[in-house]
Regions:
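ABC ATP-binding cassette signature C-motif
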Residues: 1-186
């Protein structure tokens, strides 16, 4: 499936922008996100991005989470500067109780993985320049949604979100929408 052939996609994203990507199924939303992340390369045309760019991609599988690590180990692996007690306080704030700290991440639900990815965001030594969130409100409960919205709202970097949840879009302060219609940007 080739996208944007008749009308090449021309898109500029500035540092600190908060953007929503919209479009019907098959319009190229996931393809665009993968191009921006660098996990997919364009078959034609050119893609320019600031380098180096530290990106946190919150896909629907939460692939940023290492399923072999424990919940606590996940945070410990991404920071050398935060003391143990600060990591545990953060886990509690994100509704991870002490019995869950030794749980393998592979056994977590989607909502739990999302919350853990957000914890990583707050403790990692290298904060991301860009967060890309692909349908982040799917399959999460209301308390997890509140945590997600508050965390993304307080994030000061560039934010790209694919979501059909209008309330969530307002809550995180989206400033601009890019609509992909018939495989082209509007």
């Amino acid at each position: 499936h080739i996208l944007w052939v008749d009308n090449p996609l021309n898109l500029t994203i500035f540092s600190g922008e908060r953007i929503r990507i919209q479009g019907d199924n098959g319009s190229g939303k996931s393809t665009l996100l993968k191009l921006i992340c660098g996990t997919l390369h364009p078959s034609s045309g050119e893609l320019y991005r600031s380098e180096p760019l530290n990106i946190l991609y919150l896909d629907q599988e939460y692939s940023c989470i290492d399923n072999d690590l424990t919940v606590y180990g996940q945070l410990e692996a991404c920071t050398s500067r935060k003391p143990e007690h600060e990591l545990k306080i953060l886990l509690n704030r994100f509704l991870f109780t002490p019995p869950t700290w030794d749980k393998k991440c592979g056994s977590l639900s989607g909502g739990e993985k999302m919350k853990l990815a957000l914890c990583r965001l707050l403790v990692c030594d290298n904060a991301p320049d860009l967060i890309i969130a692909d349908e982040p409100t799917n399959n999460i409960d209301i308390s997890s949604m509140d945590i997600l919205a508050a965390t993304l709202k307080s994030y000061e970097g560039t934010l790209l979100v694919v979501s059909h949840d209008e309330h969530f879009i307002r809550d995180v302060g989206i400033e601009r929408a890019i609509k992909l219609l018939n495989a082209q940007a509007e």
